[in-house]
Amino acid sequence: MRNFIRLHGSRVVRPALLAVSAVAAIAIVGGTAGTAAGYGTAPVHHDHNASRLRTEAAFDDPQLAHGELAIEGTNAGDRLALRLQSGNPAILQVDVGDDGSADFRFARAEIAKISVNGGNGDDAVRIDESNGVFTDTISTTVGGGNGDDNLVGGAGAVTLEGGNGDDILAGGSGVETLLGGNGSDSIDGNGGNDVALMGNGNDTFVWDPGDGSDVLEGQNGTDTMLFNGAGGPEQVDLSANGSRLRFFRAQGNITMDTAGVERVDFNALGGADLVTVNDLSGTDVGNVNIDLAGTLGGSNGDGAADRVVVNGTNGDDTIRVDGDAGAAKVSGLAATVNVLHPEAANDRLEINTLAGKDTVNAGGLAAGVIKLFANGVPLP
């Protein structure tokens, strides 16, 4: 995932700044596997609950019972990281405050499941697998609860639940389930073939080069898929699959299977790109924005010969092409297609009307915006 990704000029999805409010005790569970400096080993209890050595923790003590490690947040903005102990992958550390120090330690072999509930407040919780992967063998669910939460997944089958609030969910490299909940959420699946249920609100799902083929359910609200291209030539195709949108990128053999997504933003970036928008009737997509700028957030083209192809239907179509120096718009079909930052010297917009008695009206397109073709014939 990029450090910063522009979302409609205002919002960003970024790696979480993560750490759960306050300092808790260091405890050993499931044996005497190491101690914190200045402390003795904690007693081992049959219910595997961690012993508390200090009392000033805002995050409730993690509880390990019957193989489930349960971590409950507070009504404040909590910060938490989970990681394996460096040099000793048999120990799972709970870092309250995400300050790099372990506040609780548990024998990894005793854990079959992890559940984190951030509670109220704007929480930041992340899976830190820099010392090794553990979510591939331990089922892990991280819930933000109420508040604007920042949740980061891992390399295994992690479930991230935003809950209420405008949340940021960032998956890891694994095959994850990302649940936005209520609020306007920003969701980035990152690696792996993820499933995102974006929930209520006006949500945005972000895809970057290197990510997997994902399933998106926009659900309620006006939702956006933001797909960032790479610096080289790409071939992208948008088509209807029943009531679902199939967004295919040839490079990497990426297929995005979406429903309930009303807007698609594609940042083509560098290279001679080909973007084909087929008839999207039956889907929820009403707007497709294709940005031909050479950089994210830029206003200048990439200097390459880009092609945008818009295919009509087999019925009688009335298509309009409008625009000025900054953009061209194709309307009259199921989805309005906006071509942003075209270069008249390099880029071309092709309209294929297919069967039926069709009309293409380009009277609203200013000169010098983009090369326009209708059924292979250049239009002045």
Across the structure, where does each feature detected by a protein language model lie?
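Acidic, glycine-rich low-complexity segments
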Residues: 37-380
